[in-house]
Regions:
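Adenosine-cofactor binding site in Rossmann-like domains, unifying the SAM/SAH pocket
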Residues: 199-217
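Class I S-adenosyl-L-methionine-dependent methyltransferase module
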Residues: 5-196
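Conserved SAM-binding loop of SAM-dependent methyltransferases across substrates and taxa
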Residues: 2
Length: 217
């Protein structure tokens, strides 16, 4: 588990957590609250994105929409639908503390790259809510849920190399299929599976050690 994400996943699988259904319901309420806030911040871009979630769209229109999406890497856009997102991006400087009082890392870094715009809002809401969880075991399980769903929904190959771009009708359809996935709802479904397996009801931790080290160390 030399990679930190692998360390988190190993911790979650081996040690589980004690996360009651009531605690989980409160967690999802926090997630929804954060998601609603983020939706308000980029409502125009989200409305525009949703118009592409239908059958038989002109792939060139979606290609242009994606290419004109601003990020910290390409902060300028002349698309009026991106005005709100461009404003957010202007407040984020890589390597510096965020100047905004709400979570928007994925929204300002990876919108219409590795994930759709709505998906980035969902991921930021989830990650921010997870960070507020005090118990480390529970946090590890929730992070594992999020990473699992992100891996399935990402607009990329399975090893998260370069993100996929709209180049044809087929690549457009492939991307839109992935970007229609609601990350929050998929996380809820996966949590149900984890709970069924007993991963969320370990009242006494067996505590297997994970070291975040290379095997040679």
């Amino acid at each position: 588990d030399i990679e930190y994400y692998a360390y988190i996943i190993n911790q979650a699988i081996l040690n589980g957590c004690n996360f009651s259904e009531l605690e989980e319901a409160s967690f999802w309420a926090v997630v929804e609250q954060k998601y609603m806030l983020l939706q308000e911040k980029v409502s125009t871009a989200l409305f525009a994105e949703k118009t592409f979630f239908v059958d038989n769209i002109d792939y060139k229109l979606y290609q242009t929409f994606c290419e004109k999406t601003p990020s910290v890497f390409e902060p300028h856009s002349d698309d009026p639908r991106m005005k709100e997102l461009t404003e957010l991006v202007s407040h984020v400087i890589p390597g510096n503390e965020p100047a905004l009082d709400f979570p928007c890392l994925f929204l300002t870094y990876f919108a219409n790259a590795y994930f759709g715009i709505a998906q980035c809002c969902q991921i930021d809401a989830l990650r921010s809510a997870i960070e507020q969880v005090m118990d480390e075991h529970t946090k590890n399980v929730l992070l594992t849920v999020l990473m699992s769903v992100m891996s399935a929904a990402a607009s990329t190959t399975t090893h998260f190399a370069q993100f996929l771009k709209v180049k044809s009708k087929s690549t457009c359809n492939n991307l839109l299929t992935k970007r229609k996935i609601n990350i929050i709802e998929e996380c809820k479904e996966l949590m149900k599976e984890y709970r069924k397996s007993g991963l969320c009801s370990k009242k006494e931790y067996t505590t297997f050690d994970c070291y975040n080290l290379d095997f040679s160390e």
